[in-house]
């Protein structure tokens, strides 16, 4: 009986430690956030502006984003916070979606823009051949767990 109790208690702590590791590792290894001054300097170059908002149908307490998104010809600039997690990707889509069930069918048509390692105030350089006019939505997606994080329609 004592062996069974020890087995389950140690197993529970192992599972909790593993889950905490998955959650905390991206936070601990995230690059430094962009300075507000850097973000504000890029405001004059913006071609599109939108906002990530909490409360989308694909959001929950672990998957959300909130803040202003500015798009220039050469950068995606974000001033706000995104729920931390592993393996985040930025995509552009031609259709506004706000849930993984809506994104998965059109993922093959979406344009992968960049990996995302920051969860607060970031500036992502963009390949010069990305044409934002061909899309209308920016989306953040967790590739590892196939989870929608947030999206915003910019045109």
Segments (PLM) and residue ranges:
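Hydrophobic membrane-insertion alpha-helices, especially the h-region
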Residues: 5-23
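Short, surface-exposed binding/anchoring microloops in extracellular/periplasmic proteins
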Residues: 66-87
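Polybasic/polar functional segments that serve as interface/processing modules
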Residues: 1-9, 28, 93
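Short, exposed beta-strand-loop hairpins at the edges of beta-sheets
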Residues: 127-150
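Solvent-exposed coil/turn segments that connect beta secondary-structure elements
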Residues: 74, 81, 93-96, 143-145
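An anionic, turn-rich surface loop/hairpin at beta-sheet edges
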Residues: 100-128
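Beta-strand signatures of extracellular beta-sandwich domains
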Residues: 89-91
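Transition segment at domain starts
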Residues: 24-72, 104-108
């Amino acid at each position: 009986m004592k062996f069974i109790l020890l087995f389950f208690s140690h197993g529970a702590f192992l599972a909790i430690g593993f889950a905490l590791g998955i959650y905390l590792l991206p936070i601990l290894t995230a690059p430094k956030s962009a300075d507000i001054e850097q973000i504000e300097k890029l405001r004059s170059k913006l071609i599109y502006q939108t906002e990530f908002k909490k409360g989308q149908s694909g959001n929950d307490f672990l998957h959300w984003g909130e803040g202003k998104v500015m798009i220039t010809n050469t950068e995606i600039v974000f001033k706000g916070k995104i729920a931390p997690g592993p393996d985040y990707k930025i995509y552009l889509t031609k259709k506004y979606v706000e849930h993984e069930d809506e994104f998965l069918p059109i993922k093959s048509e979406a344009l992968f823009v960049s990996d995302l390692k920051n969860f607060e105030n970031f500036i992502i350089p963009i390949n010069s051949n990305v044409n934002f006019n061909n899309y209308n939505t920016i989306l953040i997606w967790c590739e590892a767990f196939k989870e929608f994080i947030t999206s915003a329609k910019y045109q």
